[in-house]
Amino acid sequence: NSYGFRPKRSASGAITKAKAFIKSGKSWVVDMDLEAFFDNVNHDILMSRIAQSISDKKLLKLIRSFLNAGMMQNGLVSKRDQGTPQGGPLSPLLSNILLHDLDRELHYRAHSFVRYADDCNIYVSSKVAAQRVLASVAKFLSSKLKLKVNLTKSAASSVQERKFLGFTLLTDGSATVSKSSLSRFKDKVRLITKRSRGMKFESIIRELNQATRGWFHYFKWADFPSPMKHLDG
């Protein structure tokens, strides 16, 4: 049920799985926001999980060095004792290794869930169940992985009140482009076509085509209305 940064898996697969859960009658979602996830990864816990699969001490030392790489702030390097370097090539892989514990726990509890990197949604059949699951999973993450759930950004609500990977999922199991995703794309189009940029017409068209192709390719899985209709006006 994990789709982020894994071979032959993608956001479209995560959306398809989520839609299947909703169609089965689980129209309430536990939408968890892990507070500053990449900044708060506990190095010792992560290294203990990695050591379960890797015995090469030199490689383990190299990974630890990667985690401890200092951060440059105001010209000074500060030591890092937790978190992973955002944008680093290993960070997505390491996040999956750490959150595999969460996957196993949710499987053990027989929950219907979809995870994409640190974005995890759990689907249940009632509001009461959603509230109970949010509290219990937050407790698990805090006690076992030293990760904090941001309760002000997390929610136990109807699926159509939240967005997941840029989509809004509806209670009938269909998906549409979320309002925020549409708004961001329109803003990008306005920026590209802004006259004050002083770019040649051909360059503007080339940049606009590139942005449009990428957006439509990602949101081609939307059920209705079509992504093109979203952009009318």
Model-derived features: positions:
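Conserved polymerase palm-domain catalytic core
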Residues: 1-161
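A structural signal for alpha-helical segments
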Residues: 6, 85, 125, 200-203, ...
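Exposed alpha-helical structural elements
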Residues: 13, 17, 45, 58, ...
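A conserved non-catalytic segment of reverse transcriptases
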Residues: 68, 142-207, 211-213
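Short amphipathic alpha-helical interaction patches enriched in hydrophobic/aromatic residues
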Residues: 124, 193, 197, 216-223
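Non-catalytic, peripheral interaction segments enriched in hydrophobic/basic residues
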Residues: 204-233
